[in-house]
Amino acid sequence: SPNTPGLRELQEKDSLRKILTHLQSENLKFDPSTGSGPKPILLKIAPDLTYEQIDDVIDLALEIRLDGLVAANTTISRENLLTHTSKLEAIGAGGLSGLPLKQRSTEVVKYICDKTEARPDDPFGRGKIPVIASGGIFTGEDAKEKINAGASLVQVWTGFIYEGPGI
């Protein structure tokens, strides 16, 4: 969350490895008293990561056997916004979602899918790890763009909030 100081540092390789290794270790423990087994673990990443940082995330996700990646969370970038700088400063820090995130989200989805290579057993040619696209999805065309970039699924939130169930 961009609203929490220092929280994004947890997406750095060493911090992320500690967290995900422990989480997956606990997740894989079977509890016979409840009959519960492992639950899917997906990691939602920031669109502000560099490609080197995304490579680190991909490597960790495959190494630790995460069930998927979600690209991408809210951004701290304010580039290309029409809102005047003084108004942005008055609003303060926080994550930006929706349409301003659309292009970067698609770029991150495509990058992850390209880096994880298509599996021959997947009729849709998806990569070694499922990627859920999130960010800037307001129309069916937006969803199609994410799928064409390699996403296995799309996650709609801001579009749903602004457009309602008729999205």
Descriptions of predicted regions:
Residues 1-34, 42-44:
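Loop-centered beta-sheet repeat module
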Residues 13-24, 54-59, 106-110, 143:
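Generic structural signal for well-ordered alpha-helices
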Residues 22-26, 30, 59-64, 111, ...:
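Alpha-helical structural signal in soluble globular domains
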